[in-house]
Structure formats: C-alpha cells, structure tokens
C-alpha cells in the first residue's frame, strides 16, 4: 500500500532555486514564504478584489485581502494544533516544529485566493461564459482541445499556481520561489482541466502551460499519482480548505448582517448551539444592550475556536487515510455532528439569503458587462500577436498590448501562450481598475 511520507511532504527546498537557503536567525524557510507572499503585489491587490459583495460602499465588509488574512490566522492555528499531536510519528523530520507547520498552512491560506480575477467567483463565471461564446464563433480554433479547456473553464486556483510559480518576483523562473511544502499545501486540485474531476467538481489546479510545474511539485513531495498529470492532495491542503470553509461560512453571515441582508437574531440562533450564551470577557453575558457587532464578534470567536478544534481532531483521526490519499470529501465531513451542522447551516443561509439578494444580482450584472468589454478588446489583440507572421499587428491591437505592461505577449509566441499572458493581465486586475479600464474602453474618458 502506497503511503506518503512526512519527511518528503514537509520539504523546505524552494522551487526554481538549485540550492537551499542559508540558515537565518529568527526566520525559517516557511516564515520566509509568508513574508514573500504578504509583501507581493499580487497579495496587495486582493485589498480591492471582491470577496462576496462587489464594489460595496460599506468599508466594514470583507474583501479578498481581509478574508485571506483571517483564513491564514485560522490555518496557522490548525497547523500548529495538528503538528503538536502528530510530531511523534517515526518519519516526522526532526527539524520541523509545530510552528513550522503552522507557517506552511498559514502561507497556503494567504495564497488561496491569489489567482482570483476581479469580481470574485462571479468574475470566473463571467470569463468562462465569454470564452464559451467566443469559442462558438470559432475564436479558439487555433488552440488544441486541452488548451481551449483552460479558457472555457477558467479557474482561479490554476491561475493562482501560475501567479505563485511564474509571475511574481522571478518571472517564469520560479516566481516567488516558495518552498515545495507550502506549494503542496496550496494545491487544492492537483489535476488539469482535461481530467474528469475538473468536470465533476468544476475545479482544477494547473494550466496546460504549467503542467510540468505541477508534476515537479507533486514528484518532489511524493504525492501519490492517480493518473496522467493527476495526483492526490497533500494532507495539509485539508487544513487550508477547512480554514477557508470556517471563515467564509461564518464571516459571510456577519457581512450579511452588516449590509442589512440578514437579521442578527437569525445568525445568533444558527450559531448558538455550539456555546449557548456567550459571555463578555469580563464575565458579563451578552444582552440586548450590546451592539450587534460586538455580540457577533464575541460569538464568532467562540464558534471559530470550536470549529478549529473539531477539524484538528478530525485530521488527527484521519491521518493515515490522508497519507494514503484516500480521504473522500473535506475535513468538516469527519468532524463532530455539531461542527458539521453549523458549517452546513451557515452555507445554506448564505446561499438562500445573501447570494440571492437583489443588490448582489445588480452588482454582478454590472461586473459582467465590464469584464465583457475588457475581454472584447484584449483577447482579439492577443490572438493577433499569436497569428502574426510579419512582426506587425494592427494599430488598435498595439494600443491594447501596450496597456498590458510586463504581461504583453511577444511577436512569435503561440496563440495559447498569448492568451495565457492576457489572462495573467486580466486576472490580476482589481475590481476598481477593471471598472476604470472598462469605462475608458467604452469612451468614458472624462
């Protein structure tokens, strides 16, 4: 029976770098990963990207950056708690401490949304719809079927791997040059768009252009290969995923109350089974005299702590199945029934009350129109470069290409690579920049 080994899974070697880091007082390789991520421009731009509510005028609701920071905090706690319990395993590397594992998961959590386009998951769907229409008109005929799938099923997770390993810092030479362990902890869907799982789950983790990077990471870490460019998950991915689930299930509801979409009483009733009445830090129970924001904040902290403990315990109990690459579903499914119900009920309330709200529909329709305008201009310009035989492109295409900066494709690249670089540019946009650019392309110059 094939089993993954912790001493390989926790590899501190950096991708794109032939030698190991010199020991540095006060910073392990995994803490350096965190620092590289948090100082990167791609991470900084998350501050102006949608979490759930596009272009909200309420500064109290979450964006991708605040969400990612909160997820990373929960992920760090999960990583430390799990490692404290399993570090006695025979193959556990002596140089890896629980706080190192916390830093790995924390870094993976920081990066988990780094490839998302403007306007959040709706932006992903809008891009897919645009390419489906473009493809129906013969626009992608210069690409192979597998290459077409990368665009027809545009995926922020695959774009995220590309951002981490290709685009930031050392462009196309390892990118951020993160450790293999952190990259493995980030790889939520270690397969390509042509894999049947990509269709059934609607997710995949690497583009055709980056499949050898996926293979390099998987082979270095000793992930179990399940098919052609298809591996099982790194066990720590489950902690990153749990941290994300915990945060967005609870925080989405808090934002819903802030925006007046949900009643505070509904959220309190949903979360109350975990802890009953929540006490103030000074020992006073919460009453109607407290502001709802304080009441929810105190309850949120208690709920998250409970869910972290439940997921950490589930990981410890399922460790061997995780190392065999056999665990089905997510960690929440193996947590205690109370934790499962809280997460499930919170997600259901968000779907029914928040994601279907009229204000969200209005903002998403506007976002779709803006992305369509941007794609209408940049994609044909990129394909013109890909088809160019005489070093000349049209005057209009030159103008679009000039706006792409370092992402501008060079004459002579394949149409597919030209489109990948174009999507690097578009996916990296913030909501605000996309709004401004779409307006300018529409003639709204003043």
PLM ranges: what are they?
Residues 1-26, 38-49, 69, 73-74, ...:
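Sequence-structural signature of the catalytic-core scaffold of metal-dependent phosphohydrolases
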Residues 1-22, 376, 392-446:
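Acidic, carboxylate-rich catalytic segments that either coordinate divalent cations
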Residues 27, 62-66:
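Low-complexity, highly charged intrinsically disordered N-terminal segments
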Residues 31-44, 335-339:
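Acidic, low-complexity proline/glycine-rich segments
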Residues 43-47, 136, 169-174, 192-196, ...:
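Intrinsically disordered or highly flexible coil/loop and linker segments, enriched in small
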Residues 49-59, 349-354:
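A short small-residue
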Residues 160, 371, 426:
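A residue-level signal for conserved active-site and pocket-lining positions in enzyme catalytic cores
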Residues 278-417, 429:
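C-terminal subdomains that position terminal phosphate/3'-OH groups for nucleotidyl transfer/ligation
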């Amino acid at each position: 029976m094939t089993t993954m080994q912790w001493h390989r899974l926790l590899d501190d070697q950096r991708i794109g770098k032939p030698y190991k880091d010199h020991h540095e007082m006060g910073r392990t390789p995994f803490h350096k990963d965190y620092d590289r991520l948090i100082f990167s421009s791609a991470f900084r731009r998350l501050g102006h990207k949608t979490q759930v509510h596009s272009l909200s005028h309420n500064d109290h609701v979450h964006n991708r950056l605040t969400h990612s920071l909160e997820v990373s905090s929960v992920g760090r706690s999960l990583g430390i708690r799990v490692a404290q319990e399993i570090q006695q395993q025979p193959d556990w590397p002596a140089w890896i401490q629980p706080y190192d594992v916390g830093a790995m998961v924390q870094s993976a959590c920081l990066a988990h949304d780094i490839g998302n386009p403007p306007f959040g998951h709706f932006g992903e769907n809008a891009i897919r719809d645009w390419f489906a229409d473009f493809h129906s008109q013969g626009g992608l005929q210069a690409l192979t079927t597998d290459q077409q799938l990368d665009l027809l099923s545009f995926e922020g997770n695959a774009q995220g791997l590309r951002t981490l390993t290709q685009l930031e810092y050392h462009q196309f030479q390892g990118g951020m040059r993160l450790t293999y362990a952190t990259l493995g902890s980030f790889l939520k869907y270690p397969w390509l768009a042509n894999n049947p799982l990509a269709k059934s789950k609607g997710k995949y983790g690497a583009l055709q252009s980056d499949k050898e990077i996926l293979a390099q990471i998987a082979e270095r870490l000793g992930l179990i290969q399940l098919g052609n460019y298809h591996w099982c998950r790194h066990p720590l991915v489950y902690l990153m995923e749990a941290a994300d689930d915990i945060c967005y299930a609870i925080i989405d509801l808090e934002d819903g109350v802030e925006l007046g979409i949900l009643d505070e009483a509904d959220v309190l009733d949903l979360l109350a089974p975990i802890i009953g009445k929540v006490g103030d830090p000074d020992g006073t129970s919460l009453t109607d005299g407290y502001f709802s924001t304080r009441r929810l904040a105190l309850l949120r902290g208690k709920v998250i702590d409970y869910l972290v403990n439940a997921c950490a315990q589930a990981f410890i109990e399922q460790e061997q199945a995780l190392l065999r690459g056999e665990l089905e579903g997510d960690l929440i499914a193996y947590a205690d029934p109370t934790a499962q119900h809280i997460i499930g009920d919170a997600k259901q309330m968000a779907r029914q009350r928040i994601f279907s709200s009229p204000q969200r529909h209005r903002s998403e329709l506007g976002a779709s129109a803006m992305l369509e305008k941007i794609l209408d201009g940049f994609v044909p310009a990129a394909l013109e470069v890909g088809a160019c035989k005489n070093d000349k492109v049209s005057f209009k295409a030159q103008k679009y290409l000039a706006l792409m900066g370092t992402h501008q494709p060079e004459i002579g690249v394949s149409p597919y690579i030209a489109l990948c670089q174009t999507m690097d540019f578009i996916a990296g946009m913030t909501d605000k920049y996309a709004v401004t650019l779409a307006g300018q392309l529409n003639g709204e110059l003043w």
